[in-house]
A protein has these predicted regions:
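C-terminal membrane-cytosol helix-exit motif in multi-pass small-molecule transporters
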Residues: 122-144
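Juxtamembrane intracellular "pre-TM" segments in multi-pass secondary transporters
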Residues: 139-167
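Hydrophobic core of transmembrane alpha-helices in multi-pass small-molecule transporters
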Residues: 30, 41-57
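Intracellular juxtamembrane helix-capping segments at the cytosolic ends
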Residues: 56-71
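Primarily marks hydrophobic transmembrane alpha-helices of the MFS/SLC 12-helix fold
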Residues: 17-20
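C-terminal ends and interior cores of transmembrane alpha-helices
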Residues: 25-39
């Protein structure tokens, strides 16, 4: 929950051109660490770091990037195209992951298949993070960090008093 609360604030002060690639590359790197078959404590730490890289850094910056790509009158269309594209790419990734799992299970074992899936998703996430460094150069990141806005408790509690926020949460 804390990751969601602070993610939006962070992407208002740090460029999404830096946040998105950094979050993706670090998430992929954490996946590669999982391949070393770490201890249970390290696995818990890795999943905690996933919360930071994905929920606090990546998703708010991704939402801001999509929002900045469209005019005020085209927000619905932009998010619809984005979600549709994300659904299609997820289906393709899932098909590839299933193929990898099936082939690696035939070769060795189910655990070998799971390791293949982790490797696939980790490498793809790192590659896409590197590609994003180039692709995000032309996007307006809408960074507000240059202003004198300070984060205070009143700013954080204001959305909690809005019925629309609670409607979206529910």
């Amino acid at each position: 929950i804390a990751a969601y609360l602070f993610g939006g604030i962070i992407c208002d002060y740090i460029s999404i051109k830096k946040l998105i690639p950094a979050a993706m590359i670090s998430t992929g790197a954490l996946g590669l660490v999982m391949l070393t078959i770490p201890s249970p404590i390290i696995m818990v730490i890795i999943h905690g770091l996933f919360a930071i890289t994905c929920l606090m850094l990546f998703f708010p910056a991704q939402t801001k990037a999509v929002r900045n790509l469209a005019s005020v009158n085209e927000q619905g269309k932009a998010f619809g195209i984005f979600e549709g594209g994300r659904g299609i790419s997820n289906a393709v990734y899932l098909a590839i992951a299933a193929l990898i799992f099936g082939q690696m299970t035939i070769i060795k074992s189910e655990s070998f298949g799971v390791r293949g899936i982790i490797l696939f998703y980790s490498v793809m996430t790192i590659l896409l993070g590197v590609i994003d460094i180039v692709l995000l150069k032309g996007i307006d990141d809408g960074k507000k960090g240059d202003s004198n806005d300070t984060v205070n408790l009143k700013m954080l509690t204001k959305p909690l008093k809005m019925p629309a926020v609670w409607l979206m949460i529910g």
